[in-house]
Amino acid sequence: MNAPAPSSARRTKKLPPLRVGIGGPVGSGKTTLLEMLCKAMRDRYDLVAITNDIYTKEDQRLLTVAGALPEERIMGVETGGCPHTAIREDASINLEAVDRMLSRFPDADIVFIESGGDNLAATFSPELSDLTIYVIDVAGGEKIPRKGGPGITKSDLLVINKTDLAPLVGANLDVMASDTKKMRGERPYVMTNLKALEGVADVIAFIEKKGLLTV
């Protein structure tokens, strides 16, 4: 991992909960990442999660069935339109969802907000998210990092998922890493195989350090 430098500050209960936005194309592994983060962090932090789908609450259902968090701590939002609108241009539906969840769980440390699947131009409004994690997958081809777009170049952390599929799709992980560094500069990235939990600890370490959750 191209990791961020540790912070000497620490988030306390006097500060609002950390809001972590998770975006990326359909099928890249956003929901899987959210599930793994919740399961790994729920014993140390008070967590709630909000998922976005266009016409259903399928991701909410998947997280509930997987036991990521208690059902009442997962809220599904039906955006009814273009996914990026609900997290950027008009984030009101998600801001309202955050307010509702925090009214139920005022001691929450982290609010995870998963966007609906979208293209490389999707970004979170700073009103909605303090940290943004953007997930792409190797199956999309090794060229994805060099295509750019705000998700690739501006997210706080880029996750390159499904590294185990690289031999099957002819993707060179070294090329993807090199292109990622060219496109992102000093911004960190992590390569993951979420199904095998590979790289999850690096994502958690990033959230804790960048989100001022640890010394």
UniProtKB/Swiss-Prot annotation:
Name the UniProt record assigns to this protein: Urease accessory protein UreG
Gene (UniProt): ureG
Source species of the chain: Burkholderia lata (strain ATCC 17760 / DSM 23089 / LMG 22485 / NCIMB 9086 / R18194 / 383)
Binding site for GTP: G24, P25, V26, G27, S28, G29, K30, T31
Gene Ontology molecular-function annotations: GTP binding; GTPase activity; nickel cation binding
CDD domains, alphabetized: UreG
Alphabetized InterPro entries for the sequence: CobW/HypB/UreG_nucleotide-bd (IPR003495), P-loop_NTPase (IPR027417), UreG (IPR004400)
Compartment annotation: Cytoplasm
Alphabetical keyword list: Chaperone, Cytoplasm, GTP-binding, Nickel insertion, Nucleotide-binding
Task performed by this protein: Facilitates the functional incorporation of the urease nickel metallocenter. This process requires GTP hydrolysis, probably effectuated by UreG.
